């Protein structure tokens, strides 16, 4: 009888996990369009925190690596004072939405294209 009760309890505990798994959030940023969708997530929708956090981490990583690789030949230059991350990412989302041709660019290439246009080095 104990093994049957244990099996039943285990099954009951697994049901909420199975139900939760059906609502998995897709966090892919292969294209600039996908990245803009993550960065522009509606904060009131389910999963928005995960999407926005992914966007912030991904874009920070891209900026750090690309600036480190560039050495003295920077692909873009922050103005002084630099814009906030939220302002920059909001402008990136708008840029992709206004110019749909950019949606198909790779996520890294699209972000760097935007930053180079928006913050050119003088």
Where do the language-model regions lie?
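Short N-proximal segments of mature Sec-exported proteins
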Residues: 27-91
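Bacterial N-terminal signal peptides that target proteins for export
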Residues: 1-8
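N-terminal signal peptide c-region/cleavage motif recognized by signal peptidases
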Residues: 14-19
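Surface-exposed, polar helix/loop patches in the mature regions of secreted/periplasmic/lumenal proteins
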Residues: 82-122
């Amino acid at each position: 009888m104990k093994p049957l009760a244990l099996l039943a309890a285990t099954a009951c505990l697994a049901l909420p996990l199975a139900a939760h798994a059906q609502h998995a959030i897709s966090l892919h940023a292969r294209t600039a369009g996908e990245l803009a969708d993550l960065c522009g997530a509606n904060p009131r929708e389910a999963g928005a925190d995960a999407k926005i956090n992914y966007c912030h981490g991904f874009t920070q990583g891209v900026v750090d690596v690309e600036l480190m690789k560039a050495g003295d030949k920077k692909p873009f230059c922050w103005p002084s004072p630099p814009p906030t991350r939220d302002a920059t990412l909001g402008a990136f989302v708008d840029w992709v939405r206004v110019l749909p041709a950019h949606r198909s660019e790779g996520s890294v290439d699209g972000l760097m294209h935007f930053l180079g246009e928006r913050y050119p080095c003088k």
